[in-house]
Design a protein with these regions (language model features):
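Active-site-adjacent structural elements that line small-molecule/cofactor binding pockets in enzymes
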Residues: 1-220
Length: 220
């Protein structure tokens, strides 16, 4: 929240996307006020990605209940925030929004069921490809587009991936991911870091970005 607020204040053109806020760990009323502040500071350039997270230690660190890591709960909390922003069912809490209906919401959904639920409260996908695999990205886009067709909406398609450039690219990725994925255990983190992300040259990165664009991505 602090970093996004600072970026909102220091910039004037770029879109600010949070990918992702694990909203199931937090109070939705307080979150609504915090995100409204970023929306105001950025003059409407803020987009909010939400999800349930995958690290139990993150929940434990703030006293949140890991059993609440559910998409149904996430949907409820997003709707509470949207009610506050719209001021339809709750008294105005402030701060005032710059965007008329609040920030655009993207869902950090991975599985098919999560994507189906995301249709009810989001404007699209804040996806992630663990192995920087174009087919994985295409499949996720197709599932989201199919899910949104049922509500006659055109989803925003955003994805992301880890990458490293240069001669030490794979080694750099391994160093980062062994630390980042350490909660999985050293052996599993080490194994996953051998294939995760894209390790290559600037040309490799540009070519992959073009593939993602051709797959229908609106942003990476």
């Amino acid at each position: 929240i602090s970093t996004l607020s600072a970026v909102a204040a220091w910039t004037s053109r770029v879109e600010i996307i949070a990918t992702i806020s694990v909203l199931t760990m937090h109070d939705p009323v307080l979150s609504a006020k915090q995100f409204a502040t970023i929306d105001m500071l950025s003059e409407g350039r803020f987009t909010l990605g939400v999800g349930v997270g995958g690290r139990e230690e993150d929940y434990e660190s703030i006293g949140a209940n890991w059993s609440q890591r559910r998409w149904a709960l996430l949907a409820d909390k997003v709707k509470i925030m949207q009610s506050i922003w719209s001021k339809e069912h709750l008294p105005a809490l402030g701060p005032n929004l710059f965007s008329s209906n609040g920030p655009q919401i993207l869902a950090g959904a991975v599985g098919p069921k999560a994507m189906e639920m995301a249709v009810n409260f989001s404007d699209g996908l804040a996806g992630f490809s663990f192995n920087a695999d174009i087919q994985e990205i295409k499949d996720s886009f197709e599932r989201v587009v199919s899910a949104f067709e049922h509500v006659e909406k055109s989803p925003r398609l955003v994805t992301s991936f880890w990458f490293g450039l240069g001669d030490s690219a794979r080694e750099d990725i391994q160093i980062h991911l062994k630390r980042y994925l350490g909660w999985m255990g050293d052996d599993l983190a080490s194994m996953l870091s051998n294939t995760a992300g894209l390790a290559g040259t600037e040309r490799d990165l540009k070519d992959f970005l073009l593939e993602i664009k051709d797959a229908g991505a609106t942003d990476v």
